[in-house]
Amino acid sequence: MAAITAALIKQVREDTGAGMLDVKKALTEAEGDVARAKEIIRAKGIAAAGKREGRKAQEGTIASKVVETANGETGYAVELNSETDFVAKTPKFVEFTEEVLGYAVDADANSADELLEAKAGDTTVKLAVEEAAALFGEHVKVGQFAKISGEHVEVYAHKKSAEMPPSIVAMIATDKAGAAVAHEAALQISAMGAKWLTREDVPADVVESERRVATEKSLAEGKPEKIVPKIVEGRLNAFFKEVVLLEQPFVKDPSKTVGDLFKEVGGNATAFARVEVGKGEEE
């Protein structure tokens, strides 16, 4: 049996992220065999991960990447959640999030479910995440996933502070001409949280719900019935300006809309996505 030295304990702790007592127990059980000790830690951790699954995991970070394709570019964004920001900002957690993003790109995944089934070395992303939960001692899960494609894809990653990893990632796909204002549009998406690109993209049931609310509100305010339809249309237009990207006032110059930015350069936006840590379950 190999001597269980402080150096050995340090090595296993650095490689696994497990606590000192857990490492000592694993090394003792493995009779000083480092590889076997790591296996023990992983096995025990995966079993414990099931107990953590019921716990809230709404902290975390987002990794993003743009890759070239035959038709232009594709952007990917993957949110990885933890229970605390203490874990989320550790270099190992950020590094693991980047690894998961890499698996998404390699598999050309189209959803979080596809990503979980993708290969991660000699295992799957789902199992790799369960192992990570064991190492970090918290419930860890893949959260939101976004993928968009276009002639050009711009990505902006927003951090709350310099020492924290990204908490918001905004991506926008444009044609070649639109690339000139894509960065400004990505900043807008991050700051203002548009939900749809054009008003035609807003689901009919959402529009009808807003129309009913606006009608009931106008009548409750005692507005003359004959002018209610005009008031309702005005309120619907205000709603569209809030939730439709191309109709939002541009944050740097509210005298124009985001759509105006693209008109000025003769370009078009074709798709966008916004991922914010902890917002997936709320929405």
Curated annotation (Swiss-Prot):
One of its GO terms (cellular component) is cytoplasm. Residues 84-87 are annotated as: Involved in Mg(2+) ion dislocation from EF-Tu. GO terms for molecular function: translation elongation factor activity. The keyword Protein biosynthesis applies. It is found in: Cytoplasm. Keywords: Cytoplasm, Elongation factor, Protein biosynthesis. It comes from the Bacteria. NCBIfam families: tsf (TIGR00116). Associates with the EF-Tu.GDP complex and induces the exchange of GDP to GTP. It remains bound to the aminoacyl-tRNA.EF-Tu.GTP complex up to the GTP hydrolysis stage on the ribosome. Belongs to the EF-Ts family. This is Elongation factor Ts. It comes from Bifidobacterium longum (strain NCC 2705). The gene is tsf.
